[in-house]
UniProtKB/Swiss-Prot annotation:
Cell location: Cell membrane
Subunit details: The complex is composed of two ATP-binding proteins (PotA), two transmembrane proteins (PotB and PotC) and a solute-binding protein (PotD).
EC number(s) given by UniProt: 7.6.2.11
Keyword Transferase: no
Catalyzed reactions: ATP + H2O + polyamine-[polyamine-binding protein]Side 1 = ADP + phosphate + polyamineSide 2 + [polyamine-binding protein]Side 1
Described function: Part of the ABC transporter complex PotABCD involved in spermidine/putrescine import. Responsible for energy coupling to the transport system.
Lineage: Bacteria, Bacillati, Bacillota, Bacilli, Bacillales
Protein name per UniProt: Spermidine/putrescine import ATP-binding protein PotA
Membrane topology according to the record: Peripheral membrane protein
Annotated organism of origin: Listeria monocytogenes serovar 1/2a (strain ATCC BAA-679 / EGD-e)
Family the entry assigns: Belongs to the ABC transporter superfamily. Spermidine/putrescine importer (TC 3.A.1.11.1) family.
Gene this chain is encoded by: potA
Binding, ATP: G41, P42, S43, G44, C45, G46, K47, T48
PROSITE patterns: ABC_TRANSPORTER_1, ABC_TRANSPORTER_2, POTA
Amino acid sequence: MIVTETIIRFENVTKQFDNDPPVLDNVSFEIEKGKFYTLLGPSGCGKTTILRLIAGFLEASKGQIYLGDKVINQIPANKRPVNTVFQDYALFPHLNVYENVAFGLRIKKLKKEAIDEKVKEALRFVNLKGYEKREISEMSGGQRQRVAIARAIVNEPEVILLDEPLSALDLKLRTEMQYELRDLQKRLGITFIFVTHDQEEALAMSDEIFVLNKGEIQQSGTPIDIYDEPINKFVADFIGESNIVNGKMIQDFEVEFVERRFECVDQGFRPNEVVEVVIRPEDLEITSAEKGQLQVTVDWMLFRGVHYEVGCIDIDGNEWLVHTTRKVRVGDKIGLAFEPEAIHVMRLGETEEEFDKRLDSYDEVQ
């Protein structure tokens, strides 16, 4: 049996500025020790506000924030065992690499020998051994990122907060840093809480993801759970690309959409309940028109390197997006085939608690 330890807990936390609508609205969640978490959502969803509340840069309007079993609402930022890596890294340009990393230790008045040992160990962890005397202005974006992380881990915090730290990097370097951050977190065993609006980053790096929108957590879970079983239209559309159509759940394992009935793997709905149906683009296979479960016309096509992105329209005007390695032409009449497992049925207005309970019932039946 795996024993987990909760390191951070939000209980009914609200954050409101003046008389504006709440930036966070009655949010509750738990963060387990030693995992990589991502707060994912569009601009203004509240993800950075959560980070600042944990760091102590903001104070909650309502609710309690716990570190372990201790309420930390009134504890100042410099007294919390938390370090933040900012989007712009916030390095001191007049200090070299060594002094940037040593800065927090000097504030704590550690002995010179202890500082030297800790700084060199932190730089070794981020693969910057030998860069101690390098000026910040001489460092690349990726190297500055590593310096900022070394400065965070040198204080041996219980939690490291990362506020969109990869957003300023080019695509290749950003991908490399994703692997490095994930590897570093595993080696350190420290809880990482990472903020991003980039879905691919979240899916690639996280043990768990919190998807936020308009100050509320829409869904939390592993990357696979959230991608394969989105709770609502927002999550389905925000995490990856989706085909979403209105439908009706006829009975367990049978759903109707585009005026046809299909076998599915979903259950626990009321007979003839109005639902939304999701099929991912990579789960649609292009066939001849007569063999397809859906008959569509190719409207446009883009080459994306590893696959073609094909936009199609069915006879009712519904748009379908397909990811395929098969080349087609605009105007072609084709069929789209898919397995029952490719169909995901979403209940309108379902809460995360209700959603989890319904998924658990699937396991009980199996």
